[in-house]
Amino acid sequence: MDERQVFVCKLIGKKELFYKGDENYLLIYVYHDQIYNLDNGTQVDTLLSNDSGVAFIVKTKEGTIYHAGDLNDWYWDGEPKADNQRLTSAYRAEIRKIKGMHFDAAFVPLDPRQGNHYADGILYFLKNVDCNVIFPMHYWNDANVIKRFITEYPQYKSRIKNTECAKGEEL
């Protein structure tokens, strides 16, 4: 089993491990707020997303990575104030669980669809978590939002990576 690649997926009403198609892949359906120890020594912790699925903390001997998935401070203009407050509270509660942790890399939403609130989630993350480098995601093919963030918050420039690159270019 050590030679298999592992994909960790959100729970869809199943607890068992199973193989689908290619026996080289092991699918593990996961719950939030759990710790999964893989055969290769990797540990995967999960947080509850306030949108869909889970966020992942992947700990290996080489380092630790955070992948937010859809966990973000989702504030939407035009939505009821109570809905926005609930999403913000849920996001902050999950980030408090990892407050003070160190990540070698993180993948965090920076979503231009949120208008003036596009950076609320990443700012809260940066203020509460230690991270060497952050790769913005969920920017809907609008990489200008990364430049906007770096311009508005130059103190984080050294840690934010522009994930828009040409085909074949490495990050």
What are the residue ranges of the model-derived segments?
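Binuclear metal-ion centers of metallo-dependent hydrolases, dominated by the metallo-beta-lactamase
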Residues: 25-39, 97, 118-171
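Glycine/Thr-rich phosphate-binding loops of Rossmann-like dinucleotide-binding domains
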Residues: 16, 75, 116, 144
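Short acidic/polar alpha-helix capping motifs at helix-coil junctions
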Residues: 18-23, 58, 85-89, 154-160
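Active-site metal-binding loops of divalent metal-dependent hydrolases
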Residues: 11-12, 49, 68-74, 110-112, ...
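Core dinuclear metal-dependent hydrolase active-site scaffold
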Residues: 25-102, 165-171
